[in-house]
């Protein structure tokens, strides 16, 4: 069974090419695969398939709204094995992998997800240097879910609930310094209102917008702290702009894994950043079977 390993600003993934969607991605095998001691280690798993194959295999009962049967489909699983609607960094790595593996010849195409279609653009992709790419993903229009609060690292933050295809609570703290953000225990479990977010929520803590940029850390549901979160950076950008009384704009979001650029318009949003493919290899069939239970 072939695999690839890649990351987008150190948000890392195991990619499983499965064009017929035949693999049984049980929570047990996904969590084992993502375990950094007993598996390959990753923040999540990306099954590389098509929407038609996923539908035929019963991955979903009907095509997600706006996704065509002929579209590529990113079947994304969190590190705990749960299914996620969307992953911005994952889409960038997914699109990069398709080009690098010669599964796709275009630099502009659509990747389907549970959250709907995500148009992608690879900028100046060079087949002679396949391991690196710069990718923009159109993330769609965000929806505001109202204000809320969460306790992160023993400190309560107030934030803005934002739907980016998955739920976020982006907390801008105008008094937070870079040093305080770096010292915050984001890895510890976060406390939030389950009535507001019954399916869980990704929580971002960020500094105020200064010189066209913010700094952010994130606790992802089903994963814990990650070095980056693509949908989280979009949510952070929306919250930072709202803090300034703006609804549209472009800014850089600094995360522990690097820097991405987010643009928010009246009708949609865009995420641009790097992708890197680290390795390809073969999973032992015996290992896979032993972790299906």
Swiss-Prot record:
The keyword Isomerase applies. It catalyses: (2S,6S)-2,6-diaminopimelate = meso-2,6-diaminopimelate. Keywords: Amino-acid biosynthesis, Cytoplasm, Isomerase, Lysine biosynthesis. The record marks 168, 220 as: Could be important to modulate the pK values of the two catalytic cysteine residues. It is found in: Cytoplasm. It is an enzyme of class 5 (isomerase). GO terms for cellular component: cytosol. Substrate binds at residues 11, 78, 88-89, 166, 202, 220-221, 230-231. SUPFAM superfamilies: Diaminopimelate epimerase-like (SSF54506). One of its GO terms (biological process) is lysine biosynthetic process via diaminopimelate. GO terms for molecular function: diaminopimelate epimerase activity. Pathway: Amino-acid biosynthesis; L-lysine biosynthesis via DAP pathway; DL-2,6-diaminopimelate from LL-2,6-diaminopimelate: step 1/1. Its EC number is 5.1.1.7. Transmembrane segments: none annotated. The keyword Cytoplasm applies. Belongs to the diaminopimelate epimerase family. Homodimer. Catalyzes the stereoinversion of LL-2,6-diaminopimelate (L,L-DAP) to meso-diaminopimelate (meso-DAP), a precursor of L-lysine and an essential component of the bacterial peptidoglycan. This is Diaminopimelate epimerase. The gene is dapF.
């Amino acid at each position: 069974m072939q695999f690839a390993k890649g990351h987008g600003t150190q948000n890392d993934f195991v990619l499983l090419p499965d064009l017929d969607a035949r693999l049984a991605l049980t929570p047990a095998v996904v969590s084992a695969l993502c375990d950094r001691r007993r598996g390959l280690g990753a923040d999540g798993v990306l099954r590389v398939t098509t929407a038609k194959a996923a539908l035929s295999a019963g991955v979903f009962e009907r095509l997600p709204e706006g996704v065509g049967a002929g579209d590529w489909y990113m079947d994304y699983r969190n590190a705990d094995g749960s299914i996620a609607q969307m992953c911005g960094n994952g889409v960038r790595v997914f699109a990069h992998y398709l080009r690098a593996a010669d599964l796709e010849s275009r630099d502009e195409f659509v990747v389907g997800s549970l959250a709907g279609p995500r148009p992608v653009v690879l900028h100046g992709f060079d087949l002679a240097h396949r391991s690196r790419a710069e990718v923009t993903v159109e993330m769609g229009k965000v929806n505001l879910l109202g204000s809320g609060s969460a306790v992160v690292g023993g400190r309560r933050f107030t934030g803005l609930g934002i739907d980016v295809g998955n739920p976020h609570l982006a907390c801008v703290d105008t008094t937070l310094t870079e040093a305080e953000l770096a010292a915050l225990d984001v890895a510890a479990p976060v406390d939030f209102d389950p009535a507001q977010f019954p399916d869980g929520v990704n929580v971002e803590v960020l500094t105020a917008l200064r010189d066209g940029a913010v700094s952010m850390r994130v606790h992802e549901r089903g994963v814990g702290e990650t070095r980056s979160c693509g949908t989280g950076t979009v949510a952070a950008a929306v919250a930072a702009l709202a803090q300034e009384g703006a609804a549209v704009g472009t800014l850089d979001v600094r995360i522990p894994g690097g820097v991405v650029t987010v643009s928010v318009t009246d009708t949609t949003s865009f995420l641009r950043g790097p992708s890197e493919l680290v390795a390809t290899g073969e999973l032992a069939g015996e290992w896979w079977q032993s972790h299906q239970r």
